[in-house]
């Protein structure tokens, strides 16, 4: 379920060097149909046996398509900026022995290290629930890591295709900077948000920015694919921090550094917390039957002993089929303990350890999905505005991508028995 070596946090300097991990928001530890090859919910970036990074070198200004094609066919990496039918700027890239490059995108072609497809909220991302038209770029972005300490990771919009080229056509937003070098934006953009205070219990949301093809930082465009770029933010960089969020317009990724993962609870810790709750034998206050969180191996079917909760008040019960207040709102129930009316849902333990900002007990549930995690983690994600569509932002559950609702977006759970 997790990347090799995740549990071996005790030796962060052990070879091979891990730069960090990318975790896709909306999945609770694995893809619904299982992690396969380069398509998975979590991807570890390790130092490569041999550097594969590239850096800009020669710039060509070309007036004919044939000349442009001749340069792009030389076998070197290049970025082409088409200014008009009669003018293209081609920037050649040469080998960089000091960096490793990792590429992310929707394409399954070999240059892509981590294949990402559109996330469907509620984790209904199955073969039956296909996106009709993806908004994620086939070659969405690239992450370049320094091979020497402190192993800095930087993000750039767009990735090189199978011909080692990046093409920015006539309609793409592109420009020449005052220092003379060309730059541009991809169609739907690559957005990044660095949390203030790192990825800890005290973290606060940062500001969403757009990253250019050359790695500069800009304010957001008016809409996702607008022609006019935002304003250059000279005080910020494209260096990824622990907890940085990367949005590819269809999927959002969380970047965790190797050091950050070293201080993150492991799957074993979350399993121990689950067993601790179950060992306390919480009871349904009405039926007095014992409740138990199901095993971490994710199941679609709700189990008989699974705890349910009224999300308006937080009271935890076993399942019962009464308390409906109306036929139109099938999920609205009246809590028998306090008479509060609201959603009544099964509770699922949040199993993806990378989303936790602390190692606290699972005491809070997101509304309306019922995923449970620590108080600090629930409150952190409840205040993070995640991009949705082409210009909207809203908070969402990191474990299933469901849009959050309610006053606080999460609720403290009230268990009957010795837990509280």
Swiss-Prot record:
<dbReference type="GO" id="GO:0061630">
    <property type="term" value="F:ubiquitin protein ligase activity"/>
</dbReference>
<protein>
    <recommendedName>
        <fullName>E3 ubiquitin-protein ligase pellino homolog 2</fullName>
        <ecNumber>2.3.2.27</ecNumber>
    </recommendedName>
</protein>
<dbReference type="Pfam" id="PF04710">
    <property type="entry name" value="Pellino_FHA"/>
</dbReference>
<dbReference type="GO" id="GO:0001934">
    <property type="term" value="P:positive regulation of protein phosphorylation"/>
</dbReference>
<dbReference type="GO" id="GO:0034450">
    <property type="term" value="F:ubiquitin-ubiquitin ligase activity"/>
</dbReference>
<keyword id="KW-0833">Ubl conjugation pathway</keyword>
<comment type="pathway">
    <text>Protein modification; protein ubiquitination.</text>
</comment>
<dbReference type="GO" id="GO:0000209">
    <property type="term" value="P:protein polyubiquitination"/>
</dbReference>
<dbReference type="GO" id="GO:0043410">
    <property type="term" value="P:positive regulation of MAPK cascade"/>
</dbReference>
<feature type="domain" description="FHA; atypical">
    <location>
        <begin position="15"/>
        <end position="202"/>
    </location>
</feature>
<dbReference type="GO" id="GO:0008592">
    <property type="term" value="P:regulation of Toll signaling pathway"/>
</dbReference>
<dbReference type="GO" id="GO:0043123">
    <property type="term" value="P:positive regulation of canonical NF-kappaB signal transduction"/>
</dbReference>
<dbReference type="InterPro" id="IPR048335">
    <property type="entry name" value="Pellino_RING"/>
</dbReference>
<comment type="function">
    <text>E3 ubiquitin ligase catalyzing the covalent attachment of ubiquitin moieties onto substrate proteins. Involved in the TLR and IL-1 signaling pathways via interaction with the complex containing IRAK kinases and TRAF6. Mediates IL1B-induced IRAK1 'Lys-63'-linked polyubiquitination and possibly 'Lys-48'-linked ubiquitination. May be important for LPS- and IL1B-induced MAP3K7-dependent, but not MAP3K3-dependent, NF-kappa-B activation. Can activate the MAP (mitogen activated protein) kinase pathway leading to activation of ELK1.</text>
</comment>
<dbReference type="GO" id="GO:0005829">
    <property type="term" value="C:cytosol"/>
</dbReference>
<keyword id="KW-0597">Phosphoprotein</keyword>
<comment type="similarity">
    <text>Belongs to the pellino family.</text>
</comment>
<dbReference type="InterPro" id="IPR006800">
    <property type="entry name" value="Pellino_fam"/>
</dbReference>
<comment type="subunit">
    <text>Interacts with TRAF6, IRAK1, IRAK4 and MAP3K7. Interacts with BCL10; this interaction is impaired by SOCS3.</text>
</comment>
<keyword id="KW-0808">Transferase</keyword>
<dbReference type="Pfam" id="PF20723">
    <property type="entry name" value="Pellino_RING"/>
</dbReference>
<dbReference type="InterPro" id="IPR048334">
    <property type="entry name" value="Pellino_FHA"/>
</dbReference>
């Amino acid at each position: 379920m997790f990347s090799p070596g995740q549990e071996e946090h005790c030796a962060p300097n052990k070879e091979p060097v891990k730069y960090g991990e990318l975790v896709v928001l909306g999945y609770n530890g694995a893809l619904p149909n299982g992690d396969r090859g380069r398509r998975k919910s979590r991807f570890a970036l390790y130092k490569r046996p041999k550097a594969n990074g590239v850096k800009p070198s020669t710039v060509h200004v070309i007036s004919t398509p044939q000349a442009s094609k001749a340069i792009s066919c030389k076998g070197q990496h290049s970025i082409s900026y088409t200014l008009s039918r009669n003018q293209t700027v081609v920037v050649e890239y040469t080998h960089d022995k000091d960096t490793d490059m990792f590429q992310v995108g929707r394409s399954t072609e070999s240059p892509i290290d981590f294949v990402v497809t559109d996330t469907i909220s509620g984790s209904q991302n199955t073969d039956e629930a296909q996106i009709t038209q993806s908004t994620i770029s086939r070659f969405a972005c690239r992450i370049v890591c320094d091979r020497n300490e402190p192993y800095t990771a930087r993000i750039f919009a767009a990735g090189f295709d199978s011909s080692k080229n990046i093409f920015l056509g006539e309609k793409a937003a592109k420009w020449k900077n005052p220092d003379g070098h060309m730059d541009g934006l991809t169609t739907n953009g690559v957005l990044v948000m660095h949390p203030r205070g790192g990825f800890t219990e005290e973290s606060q949301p940062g500001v969403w920015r757009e990253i250019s093809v050359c790695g500069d930082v800009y304010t957001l465009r008016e809409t996702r694919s607008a022609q006019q770029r935002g304003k250059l933010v000279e005080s910020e960089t494209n260096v990824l921090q622990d907890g940085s969020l990367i949005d590819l317009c269809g999927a959002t990724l969380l970047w965790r550094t190797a050091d950050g993962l070293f201080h993150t609870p492991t799957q074993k810790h979350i399993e121990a917390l689950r067993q601790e709750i179950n060992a306390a034998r919480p009871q349904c206050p009405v039926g007095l039957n014992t409740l138990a969180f199901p095993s971490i191996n994710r199941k679609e079917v709700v189990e008989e002993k699974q705890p349910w909760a009224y999300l308006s008040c937080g009271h935890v019960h076993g399942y019962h089929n009464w308390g409906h207040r109306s036929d139109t709102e099938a999920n609205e129930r009246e809590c028998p303990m306090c008479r509060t009316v609201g959603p009544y849902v099964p509770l699922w333990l949040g199993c993806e350890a990378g989303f936790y900002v602390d190692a606290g007990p699972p005491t809070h549930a997101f509304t309306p999905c019922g995923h449970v995690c620590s108080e600090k983690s629930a409150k952190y994600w409840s205040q993070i505005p995640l991009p949705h569509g082409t210009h909207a932002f809203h908070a969402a559950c990191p474990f299933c991508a469901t849009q959050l609702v309610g006053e606080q977006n999460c609720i403290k759970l009230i268990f009957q028995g010795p837990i509280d």
